[in-house]
């Protein structure tokens, strides 16, 4: 048994220049595990609470000294002396100490950073990679796959300062024989897209997740630009490269209406479902995330019945990585996939529970970053360890995004054929 000797919290910076929480878990053996909590921009109302200080004199109120203090003063004495390999016990201790449904007392950012740091320390102590340790915890040792990257190459919505309503326009290199080649294909399309946009006199600055963020006349114009870039890169759209959307519909849903102000259109839920169905019939869109508002379950039902048999419908704000909400969705046949974000629920154990529930119900699970990221690459190991099959970690620029891709390259080099890349087969 490897015991925890110390737990230390720090205030560090994320990719948007805002503070976030870093935790170190130190073992009696001297091994140290370090992890950072990410932060979202478009957030579901039922996400676990990200504890911020609210002191306007520091970081415009976004400091996390309270969360750091909760690690150093409350969590540390509870975990010192505990077995670092007992992940669920450690997480349960922190959840019990918090005592709230949404982790409002200690902060999901504090609990998560410690939870992930403990897993990293345990993996190092065992002398195995993090993905192997997570697979052990998950009860799926050795059952690995390499995820299909869903690369967000045009950013809109809350992730960019432009007029595009849909938040993410993504490509998936589904024909690649392995992850390494998939990454190359995506990078080539990314560079091709820059030339396409520049050729139209459009801005090629990037948004929070590393994708381009130009002003465009419509959401469909983004798809048209990507289609041109795919062809210019020498690939066949629909065969080698497919598309995905993250609508983040909760950001433009008001009073029962989907108000896409960027292109001056308003839709009822039924009309918006028709709009998305039309896009999915016109372009090879394999996946649509948050196609309806998180509270519009009737709209979700309409959308699921309309295109759920042919398109992956991912619940992000809808499910917030929460098993209680996911179970309700499964029981009501709402959506057919869940987005997995550590900090929506706030601990590794609860994250694994959500993935397992989804997979057992025949739902896909898409592992995801947040728009506010750090150099932490845990989601790469999580995707491989759980054989989730899909990962969202941004575009092919910004080191906070590329760090995850580089980690996946190293994992594939280690595992080889033990972690197959299944491409289109991952999209049910």
From Swiss-Prot:
Listed Pfam families: Enolase_C, Enolase_N
Cellular compartments per GO CC: cell surface; extracellular region; phosphopyruvate hydratase complex
Keyword NAD: no
UniProt family annotation: Belongs to the enolase family.
An individual GO BP term: glycolytic process
GO MF: magnesium ion binding; phosphopyruvate hydratase activity
Species lineage: Bacteria, Pseudomonadati, Pseudomonadota, Gammaproteobacteria, Cellvibrionales
Cofactor: Mg(2+)
KW Lyase (keyword) present: yes
Keyword tags: Cytoplasm, Glycolysis, Lyase, Magnesium, Metal-binding, Secreted
Entry-linked NCBIfam families: eno
CDD domains (UniProt xref): enolase
Pathway of action: Carbohydrate degradation; glycolysis; pyruvate from D-glyceraldehyde 3-phosphate: step 4/5
Protein name as it appears in the record: Enolase
Protein residues bound to (2R)-2-phosphoglycerate: 167, 341, 370-371, 392
Catalytic activity, reaction form: (2R)-2-phosphoglycerate = phosphoenolpyruvate + H2O
PANTHER family (UniProt xref): ENOLASE (PTHR11902:SF1)
UniProt enzyme class: lyase
PROSITE patterns in the cross-refs: ENOLASE
